[in-house]
Curated annotation (Swiss-Prot):
It comes from the Bacteria. GO terms for cellular component: endospore-forming forespore. Keywords: Sporulation. This is Spore coat protein I. It is found in: Spore coat. InterPro entries: Aminoglycoside_PTrfase, CotS-like, Kinase-like_dom_sf, Spore_coat_CotS. GO terms for biological process: sporulation resulting in formation of a cellular spore. Pfam families: APH (PF01636). It comes from Bacillus subtilis (strain 168). Belongs to the CotS family. NCBIfam families: spore_CotS (TIGR02906).
Length: 357
């Protein structure tokens, strides 16, 4: 399967949709686009399949006499795309299981057509992980640990900006708390809406918790850890999960679609894997939590201080924030019950995590 993918450096601090069938005319245009772009590579296409064609990120499977390759149009700002392209090349050449990048005829890792960058990758065959199966859950967490470890040492070429979130968490907490406060004004304007009524009744306590969590983070080893990591940072995938991983032959764990990578503490990816998964059950599942953490630590152990930082970050109401944002920013018509479930999960999660801190 295809990836769906400081000297002389600018440092930039950063703060799955369904595919509709393509018309025959659109498919023909996309195939012609691929044929045109591929002229820049030593690739003789025998057949071209459009894999993803209704999004800004386009993906083709290109069949050649020596096997399949993947052509992708990257839907990212150019500076961000370059950071991730060179990161993927670094990891592949280091032996990490990420799709290798095929240079074009000029020796470049990418070609630019219009305002987009195009890249040709190795085509990876494998199956997606099933996270209800313990062995798959362990595999995917071990793959994440290997990714973090292998990424240490990456520095983009001169002129390519560095994308980092190191040291930015306290600001992110503050921003989200302010947004949840501002959204009260939107709820006030919808006083007849049950979702908004519940939001106004309950949200203040969670905003206060978020600010207390920020203070707790600053009192932990978060700051010294980030300062230490800035000297030799690892990458965070930031979108790690079943959509961006594959289990290949001989239990090879492949990490694909590195478009979102950034420098940050490795525990960011752990939190983004563990907390949403447990949220799907409606209860705090200690067994699943421990399976995931133990599998990761079997490849990349964390110190007790590092785990404390992770538990504090997990306390922040990210999942609740996402539900509220869906309502007031994306204007989705959410029922009151969805907010009730989000509030309840935050309470369950907090009770479990406070026993670990």
């Amino acid at each position: 399967m295809c990836p769906l993918m400081a000297e002389n450096h600018e440092v930039i601090e950063e703060g799955n949709s369904s595919e509709l069938p393509l018309s025959a005319e659109d498919a023909k245009k996309l195939t012609e686009l691929a044929e045109n772009v591929l002229q820049g590579w030593d690739v003789q296409a025998e057949k071209i399949d459009v894999i993803q064609g209704n999004q800004m990120a386009l993906v083709w499977k290109v069949h050649t006499d020596s096997g399949a390759v993947c052509l992708k149009r990257i839907h990212r700002p150019e500076k961000k795309a370059l950071f991730s392209i060179f990161a993927q090349d670094y990891l592949a050449k280091k032996g990490m299981n990420v799709p290798g990048i095929l240079p074009n005829k000029k020796g470049s890792l990418y070609s630019k057509h219009g305002s987009f960058l195009f890249v040709v990758y190795d085509w990876i065959e494998g199956r997606p992980f099933e996270l209800t199966v313990k062995q798959d859950l362990e595999f995917i967490m071990k793959g994440l640990a290997d990714f973090h470890t292998a990424s240490v040492g990456y520095q983009p070429p001169n002129g390519v900006p560095i994308f980092t979130k190191l040291g930015r968490w306290p600001n992110h907490y503050t921003k989200r708390c302010k947004q949840m406060e501002t959204w009260k004004l939107m709820a006030e304007a919808e006083k007849e809406d049950p979702f908004s009524q519940l939001y106004l009744q309950e949200i203040d306590g969670f905003i206060e918790d978020g600010l207390r969590i920020k203070d707790r983070l600053l009192q932990s080893t978060y700051v010294p850890w980030t300062e230490q990591l800035k000297k030799s940072p690892n990458l965070c995938h930031q979108d790690y999960g079943t959509g961006n991983t594959l289990l290949g032959e001989n239990e090879q764990i492949w990490v694909i679609d590195l478009d979102t990578v950034s420098f940050d503490l490795p525990i960011r990816d752990l939190r983004k894997m563990i907390i949403p998964l447990l949220d799907t059950t409606g209860v705090w599942d200690d067994e699943t939590f421990n399976v995931m953490l133990n599998a990761y630590e079997s490849r990349a152990p964390l110190t007790e201080e590092q785990k404390q930082v992770m538990f504090i970050d997990m306390l922040f109401p990210y999942e609740l924030y996402d539900v509220i944002r869906e309502k007031y920013v994306r204007k989705s018509a959410l029922p009151k019950e969805e907010l009730e479930s989000a509030f309840e999960y935050e309470r369950i999660k907090a009770n479990a995590l406070r026993q670990l801190i």
